[in-house]
Each structure stands twice: as structure tokens, then as C-alpha cells.
Amino acid sequence: MTATQPRPTRAGNKLEGRVAFVTGGTRGIGAAICRSFAGQGAAIAAGYSGNQQAAEQFCKDIGSTHPDSRTTVHRGDIGSAEDCRRTIAEVIEQHGRLDILVNNAGITADKTVLKMTDDDWRRVIDVNLSGAFYLSQAALEHMLDRGTGRIVMVSSVIGETGGIGQANYSSAKAGLFGLTKTLAREAAMQVQRKGLTDGIGVTINAVTPGYTATEMLETVPDKVLDALKAKIPLGRLGLPEEVARVVHFLSADASGYITGQVWGVNGGLDM
């Protein structure tokens, strides 16, 4: 941002008073989701696993562009059940509540099935699928007590189509579909039992991004990118902000009658 550019300000107050925890929230799609939430007044808890300096800088950047939105960063290993539960407790302790959980963090360890090691398989499943379960389990306990909350799973179009060398990744991302639908049914059942159906409810949905212009694609050769774009009916890569807008909608009150659904944000790749 240059000195001549206007500083972004709050775009509205639809999420004012809400607290959103976004895993993998300091870069790529996760960072775009955090900015979108902050623009509508939400307090942000951004999860990260590695670069503390970059995470703290992201926190400062959000604070400078959205001074009315409190932002914290939380380090943890999403593949660890203990760390997932600790992080949820930490967010609630620091912010006093948790209204929105976005399970966005993910890793890859691509190898063809005959070359994939046990560790390659387990680590990707642990982070991309099991971590989403542990985080959601801990968050739901808090949300169901209050009768309100939103959980959004960031899956992938690869969970629908499969991908060569991605048996672990595609299995984990496909697993998020079943997890989403099961948690949605259980949450709805619990809310009904508590007699809290008149509120905004507790909903769980998923989005499936396609090939998106993030840091992960910056080192991909142009020829490979051109081949990827040729597969996309809309003929271009997606933008992190385009995914963020759908996640934002599914996290807001306006989506209160939508639960257990999978939303494609992939330029038509899953048609």
C-alpha cells in the first residue's frame, strides 16, 4: 500500500460483535477471509503453524487497515488433537466467545500411490481432515451452549475430482464433505432439543475452491498454469477474495437457513 492509496475502512457492521477463528488465516485464502470478516466488524483470531514473524506482521496489517477490529494470532499444530482443543480454548479465553470457525488450514505431500509413504498419508489426513474434526468438536461445544454459530470447511475441488499424486489430499478433502453433513445434522438436532430454533442457529457448510491465485502457485511455470486454466470453464484462476466472499456469506446471519451444503467456488471445474 502506498501513501497515496486510501486506507481500507470498515465496509459495514454485519459481523460486529462476532469473533471469527480462521485456521491458516495469515496467508492466501485464509488471509482474504480474515480481511473480509474484519471489513464487517468481526474480531479476528488467525491461526498459523510456522512463521511467527509473518503472522505478527499480518496481525499489525489488519490492525492498521481495520483499526476497529481486534486481531490476534494463534500458533498450533492442526494435526494434533491436543493443540486443536488448546487453540479453541485460547481464542475463547482471549476474545470471550467464538462465533465463526473456518477450517481453512491444509497441507500437501503429493506422490503417486505406489510411492506414498505411511507418513505422507497420515500427516495430510491428520491436518486436512482430523484437525477439522477436532477444532469443530471443541467449537461446537461452545456454540451449542449458546445456540448460535457458524462453521465453514474449506475443502477443494480435488475432493470431488481426485488428482494424480494426491490420494491423501483428495481423500481428506472429500472426507470434509461427510464431516460437514454429519456435523450439520447433529448441530441442528441439538439446537432443536434446546428449543433455540428461533435464533440464527448453528450451521455447518463447506466450500470447494478450485485453482486459486495464491502463494502456492507463484512458482508454477507459466506452461503449467496455462494448462490448468485450459481446464477451467471460466478460463482463469480464482482469486482468494472470491472464495472469501462465499465463506463470508456462509458465516453471516443471512445464511441461517443453509446448512450441510457444499458450495463450489472453482470456475465450473466440478460441472
Summary of predicted features, one role per range:
Residues 188, 198, 203, 258-260:
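Short, small/polar-rich loop/turn modules that mediate ligand/substrate recognition or access, typified
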Residues 40-57:
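Conserved glycine-rich Rossmann-like NAD(P)H-binding loop of the short-chain dehydrogenase/reductase
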Residues 26-27:
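Conserved glycine-rich cofactor-binding loop
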